[in-house]
Amino acid sequence: METKLPPASTPTSPSSPGLSPVPPADKVDGFSRRSLRRARPRRSHSSSQFRYQSNQQELTPLPLLKDVPASELHDLLSRKLAQCGVMFDFLDCVADLKGKEVKRAALNELVECVGSTRGVLIEPVYPDIIRMISVNIFRTLPPSENPEFDPEEDEPNLEPSWPHLQLVYEFFLRFLESPDFQPSVAKRYVDQKFVLMLLELFDSEDPREREYLKTILHRVYGKFLGLRAYIRKQCNHIFLRFIYEFEHFNGVAELLEILGSIINGFALPLKTEHKQFLVRVLIPLHSVKSLSVFHAQLAYCVVQFLEKDATLTEHVIRGLLKYWPKTCTQKEVMFLGEVEEILDVIEPSQFVKIQEPLFKQVARCVSSPHFQVAERALYFWNNEYILSLIEDNCHTVLPAVFGTLYQVSKEHWNQTIVSLIYNVLKTFMEMNGKLFDELTASYKLEKQQEQQKARERQELWQGLEELRLRRLQGTQGTQGAREAPLQRFVPQVAATGGQS
């Protein structure tokens, strides 16, 4: 009887075993972008590896693994692995249907066997297993036909060979998770070259493939201790090329999710290598255009670092202020959400180091004409822990934001924002009424002085304009006086015929 693959076999981001949960994107950015641009239609692509070879041998069904005696099991397993190494053309839906079905049935059987049968993974089958996996998954990814591909709006190019490829990934995953799996044997085949090719597959446009790759790479990182430093190094290279060269790599979110779990397991004190990764890679990642695709995972990694070492807070906040978006309001909302997550875990001793520059930026966000940016900034005062930090440092935070709050409360076009500002001002008044009154008086005096200077400036310009007009009139009068004798002289010359 044919063994079916369980429908729940595809790993998903929140429920992938061994991966730390990542905050949902709506916690960071509660204002989804709605675009009127029509999503581009999905087109079929095929990797170069899956081009059909007309001279390939026709597949015939082999006996079921469960029907053969134990003495013949491993020989039949090797034959089935070789059978599953035959590739088919999935762009032609009707080509070699029998062979495709034979391979699919064999893959289903292998998945079931390696997941439930003990003693099947002996040393001689390891090279056959890795060879079959490599032949199926390692391929040249097709270039995207759309250079302006937007993962949020455009349909990805799905892998046509997924009916077979999914089963190969599922087999690989169960192979790594099997109780009989021996890393000491597998490390001869799962080496640095294998890992590098595995990482290159993260650029696949098919999100189903990237989900499997994420879980598999995490298992490889956990099983092969000797490859851990190499995996981190190659991830660094991918991120740096993404930031400074191409700004295109489809698997950034998945790699960051893996790294979030890895960071969570870092031993203390943190190594210099890990701190440099935060400062030189994670912080500059905030500058790329496609930040919204992976920001939730990136923010999670940053917060994980700060929970490990609070002294990194100042570097992180100043880095965020350095890359703070100037023209993209959607990114501003995401930055504000990440700052709130950081403030949720910040130590009071670290808060005093960044409070002034941070809340000056928050004040600029409050004054934004885009109401979502202003609203997101004002929501800081709804967070009890942040409010307690502000109250303890009211003498610094209040002067940094008071002028902006007072002015925007009089001028902002959105009444919701005005109401929120009134609530914030009321909170400040209750925190420190004396300081609030002093700042109010100082603000009004400053405004009066500004108005006085504006009047003086206006009077000065008005006086200069009057002086210019008088000089202009005086010049015209002098010119008229000089021209009068000449006008009297011209008729006399005409009367004498020009003779002296």
Swiss-Prot record:
Chain intervals with Low complexity compositional bias: 1-19
Cellular component, GO, one term: nucleus
Tissue: Highly expressed in brain.
Intrachain disulfide bonds: none
Basic residues composition bias: residue spans: 34-45
Primary subcellular site in the record, as a coarse category: nucleus
GO molecular function: protein phosphatase activator activity
Modified residues (Phosphoserine): 32, 35, 44, 46-48
Residue segments, region Disordered: 1-55, 474-500
SUPFAM superfamilies noted in UniProt: ARM repeat (SSF48371)
Record's keyword terms, sorted: Nucleus, Phosphoprotein
Subcellular location per the Swiss-Prot or TrEMBL entry: Nucleus
Single biological process term from Gene Ontology: signal transduction
UniProt KW Methyltransferase keyword: no
Top-level division of the source organism's lineage: Eukaryota
Family: Belongs to the phosphatase 2A regulatory subunit B56 family.
Function: As the regulatory component of the serine/threonine-protein phosphatase 2A (PP2A) holoenzyme, modulates substrate specificity, subcellular localization, and responsiveness to phosphorylation. The phosphorylated form mediates the interaction between PP2A and AKT1, leading to AKT1 dephosphorylation.
SUBUNIT field: Component of the serine/threonine-protein phosphatase 2A complex (PP2A). This complex consists of a common heterodimeric core enzyme, composed of a 36 kDa catalytic subunit (subunit C) and a 65 kDa constant scaffold subunit (PR65 or subunit A), that associates with a variety of regulatory subunits. Proteins that associate with the core dimer include three families of regulatory subunits B (the R2/B/PR55/B55, R3/B''/PR72/PR130/PR59 and R5/B'/B56 families), the 48 kDa variable regulatory subunit, viral proteins, and cell signaling molecules. Interacts with SGO1. Interacts with AKT1.
Protein name: Serine/threonine-protein phosphatase 2A 56 kDa regulatory subunit beta isoform
Organism: Oryctolagus cuniculus (Rabbit)
